[in-house]
Amino acid sequence: MLVADFIRRVPLFEDLDDRSVTAIANAVVEQSYAPGQEIVREGDTGVGAFIIRSGRCEVLQRRGADPSRIGELGPGDFFGEMALLDEFPRSATVRALEPTTCLGLTRWHFRGILESHPQIALGLLPILTRRLRNSERQVTEALHH
C-alpha cells in the first residue's frame, strides 16, 4: 500500500483532501524497529510523532521505580503527537513488541504543513483532548489509591 493511501486511513487524517495527504506523505520517513527496541523513551525530548504502519507496540509509563504497561498500539495508531506542538519530555516509552514499521513526522515538517493545511490542527484537537482527559483521570485515580 502506498504511503498516501495508508495515511488516508489514519483517523487523524481521514477527512483531509488529497493535497494535504500528499503533503504529509512527502514529509514522513519510514523507519523499522525490532522486537524490544524502544521507539521513544519517557523523559527524552521529542522532535516528532509516529504512525504505526505495521506491527505492534506497548506503551510504558513509570509509576514509581518500575515502568507499567498502560497500553498497546497497532497499525494506524499514532503516538508522540505532543512533540509536534512542544518541546517537553516524552510522557511515555513506546517499545516494539514485534517487527514494527513506523512513519515519522518531525515537528518542523508538521508546522510547515499546518501553515498550508490548518484543518489538520482541528483533527488533532479532539485526540489531544481525549488524551489529556485520560491523563487527568489517571492522576486522580493515583491520588485516591
Predicted regions and their residues:
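Short, flexible segments with low predicted structural confidence
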Residues: 21, 65-66, 100, 128
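Conserved polymerase palm-domain catalytic core
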Residues: 1
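Cyclic-nucleotide recognition modules
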Residues: 6-9, 69-126, 133
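Regulatory nucleotide-sensing modules
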Residues: 4, 8-65
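Signal-transducing coiled-coil/dimerization helices and immediately adjacent hinge/linker segments
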Residues: 140-145
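Short hydrophobic/aromatic patches on the structural cores and recognition surfaces of FHA
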Residues: 17, 36, 55-57, 76, ...
